[in-house]
């Protein structure tokens, strides 16, 4: 039903494990077909480097996930457009290498429509995914033009821009917040020297459910979380260390304002500026980085 006049087109079908008699058995990452002057419709494999024993393809494309290897192939081709189904992090990740991949893709192609699926789509992966309709940019159109984005199952429709000013990231303007030089915000670890500046502000970095989302809260001295792991590798919780130290009253006000700011941004951008947490359940769970959380606190402290 997608193509009405099929007789006017030539189709090529490739699959590493063909289920259709017309499909050609082929590993299209190991041995890519020619995409030049073709419309590509596919759902490439998603598999992170650290989940795969074989590192050959990751080394070949200098990528850390198989779907990014495919994206690299598209960028290097003369493809005229297509529809791809890829992890949502392709348009949300704030990793430097991912931003660079997104920039290269956007310089080559114009994104016409994005569909975001916040419920699990595939039985074999809990990744939040999106489908992207793109065409080759032949007119030099503004890379920052708005992209119509549909979100399911809520049926929300938003316009997004992916441009240099927001690091080609949805809601990426938040990473350019002005911050105060007067305050330093970090987290409490076994290496923390200025113990007197350890606050009673606990940062929860991952959504658990609709009723237990990421954010800040005041806790007792006994509930403060100190990262005592060998390599300081804890990423789910952090107790803030603020220099110079601030009073309990100031801490309480900071928690209130920081949570309100995060809620405002999550509503504005449908939480898409936050990294997707793979194990989603009743909601599309998100993760906030220490760096962004500390930046938000520093920004708010500087406003007072």
Where are these regions (language model features)?
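C-terminal target-recognition/interaction regions appended to catalytic cores
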Residues: 192-304
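A short acidic (Asp/Glu
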Residues: 1-4, 22-24, 51, 93-97, ...
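Short, solvent-exposed loop/turn segments at secondary-structure junctions
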Residues: 18-19, 45-47, 89-91, 121, ...
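Short acidic, S/G/P-rich loop/turn micro-motifs used as interaction or catalytic elements
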Residues: 46-49, 89-93, 191-193, 246-247
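Conserved S-adenosyl-L-methionine
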Residues: 1-38, 42
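Conserved Class I SAM-dependent methyltransferase catalytic core
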Residues: 63-120, 126, 131-133
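Flexible, glycine-/basic-rich loop-and-beta segments that form/coincide
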Residues: 125-189
């Amino acid at each position: 039903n997608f193509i009405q006049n099929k007789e006017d087109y030539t189709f090529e079908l490739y699959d590493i494990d063909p289920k259709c008699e017309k499909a050609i058995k082929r590993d299209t990452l190991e041995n890519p077909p020619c995409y030049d002057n073709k419309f590509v419709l596919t759902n490439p494999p998603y598999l992170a480097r650290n989940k795969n024993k074989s590192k050959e393809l990751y080394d070949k494309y200098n990528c850390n996930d198989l779907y990014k290897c495919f994206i690299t192939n598209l960028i290097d081709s003369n493809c005229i457009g297509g529809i791809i189904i890829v992890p949502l992090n392709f348009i949300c990740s704030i990793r430097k290498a991912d931003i660079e991949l997104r920039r290269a893709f956007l310089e080559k192609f114009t994104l016409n429509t994005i569909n975001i699926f916040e419920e699990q789509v595939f039985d074999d992966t809990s990744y939040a995914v999106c489908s992207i309709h793109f065409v080759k940019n032949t007119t030099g159109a503004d890379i920052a033009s708005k992209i119509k984005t549909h979100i399911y199952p809520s049926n929300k429709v938003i316009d997004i821009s992916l441009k240099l000013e927001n690091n080609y990231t949805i809601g990426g303007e938040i990473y350019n917040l002005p911050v105060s030089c007067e305050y330093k915000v970090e987290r409490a670890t076994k290496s923390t020297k200025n113990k007197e500046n350890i606050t009673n502000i606990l940062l929860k970095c991952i959504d658990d459910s609709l009723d237990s989302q990421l954010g800040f809260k005041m806790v007792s001295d006994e509930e403060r979380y100190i990262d005592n792991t060998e390599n300081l590798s804890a990423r789910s919780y952090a107790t803030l260390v603020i220099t110079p130290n601030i009073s309990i009253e100031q801490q309480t006000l900071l928690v209130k304002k920081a949570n309100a700011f995060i809620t405002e941004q999550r509503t504005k951008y449908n939480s898409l500026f936050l990294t997707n947490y793979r194990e989603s359940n009743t909601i599309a769970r998100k993760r906030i980085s220490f760096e962004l959380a500390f930046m938000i606190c520093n920004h708010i402290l500087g406003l007072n």
